[in-house]
């Protein structure tokens, strides 16, 4: 039961993050608040 609850919470979190990403399209790297790079209106996290 706990595993199902964790899975549902993670699914909701991912859906919210995807929704926010589509609503707030970036125009440059400053729109990503230093957490990533803007590419075609979407902020991608910086790895490494």
From Swiss-Prot:
Segment forming the signal sequence: 1-21
Record localization: Secreted
Tagged with keyword Disulfide bond: yes
Chief location of this protein within or outside the cell: secreted
Disulphide bonds in the chain: 26-38, 32-43
Tissues expressed in: Expressed in salivary glands. Highly expressed in the head, body and tail with a 2-3-fold higher expression in the head.
Cellular component GO terms held in the UniProt record: extracellular region
Methionine amide modification, residue list: 47
Entry keyword Secreted: yes
Keyword line: Amidation, Disulfide bond, Secreted, Signal
Propeptide section residues: 22-27
Note, other: Does not show effect on voltage-gated calcium channels, potassium channels, and tetrodotoxin-sensitive sodium channels. Does not show activity on Nav1.7/SCN9A, and shows very weak activity on cation channel TRPA1.
Family from the record: Belongs to the annelide toxin family.
Role played: Leech salivary gland peptide with unknown function.
Name listed for the protein in its UniProt record: Peptide HSTX-V
Organism, scientific name: Haemadipsa sylvestris
């Amino acid at each position: 039961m706990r595993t199902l609850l964790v899975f549902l919470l993670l699914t909701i979190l991912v859906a919210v993050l995807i929704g926010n990403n589509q609503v707030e399209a970036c125009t440059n790297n400053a729109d990503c608040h230093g957490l990533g790079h803007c590419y075609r209106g979407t902020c991608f996290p910086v790895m490494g």
